[in-house]
Amino acid sequence: MNKVTKTAIAGLLALFAGNAAATDGEIVFDGEILKSACEINDSDKKIEVALGHYNAEQFRNIGERSPKIPFTIPLVNCPMTGWEHDNGNVEASFRLWLETRDNGTVPNFPNLAKVGSFAGIAATGVGIRIDDAESGNIMPLNAMGNDNTVYQIPAESNGIVNVDLIAYYVSTVVPSEITPGEADAIVNVTLDYR
């Protein structure tokens, strides 16, 4: 080999060796693709919840709530055979991942969906909170629910599970600062089987 070729090869080896030594760690991805998963039992996959109409004066203080409105996410075709979860448990269960992709959350209130308007002017000074109906736990938005809110898929369920939730408005300002208008929001639902 000539001197130029040897120098070029030595330079390339040094370049690649430097890249290999420059790492500070590694990321190991672990997961599983399930053969089947629960499906929302509605043709358009949309659950509509009518929260009602309220006077701003009904919210007397910051944190005041409207009446709680129960609703259900009906699921079918859920897998009934258990699998290993992140916590090591082997069971047929899932958690909810609720995302506010369109409007986000109310600033300084990460678990309140920011309201907007589907047709008109949006109200301000309130947000929408979602709770688990059974436990009363606040459902986190844009974050994974904790292990305290896990929905089991019983073997005798034939793959049918109802997720019962509650929604309501919560004021984030004093009544004089609430502006009237539409108080709508969309929250996207993902079932997480970790």
UniProtKB/Swiss-Prot annotation:
Name the GO terms of the biological process aspect: cell adhesion; cell adhesion involved in single-species biofilm formation
Keywords in alphabetical order:
Disulfide bond, Fimbrium, Signal
Highest taxon, organism lineage: Bacteria
Q: Spell out the GO cellular component terms annotated for this protein, sorted alphabetically and separated by semicolons.
A: pilus
Q: Name one Pfam family in it.
A: Fimbrial
Q: What induces it?
A: Expression is negatively regulated by H-NS and subjected to cAMP receptor protein (CRP)-mediated catabolite repression.
Note, other = The operon is cryptic under classical laboratory conditions, but is functional when constitutively expressed.
Q: Which family does it belong to?
A: Belongs to the fimbrial protein family.
**Protein name in UniProt:** Uncharacterized fimbrial-like protein YraH
Species of origin reads Escherichia coli (strain K12)
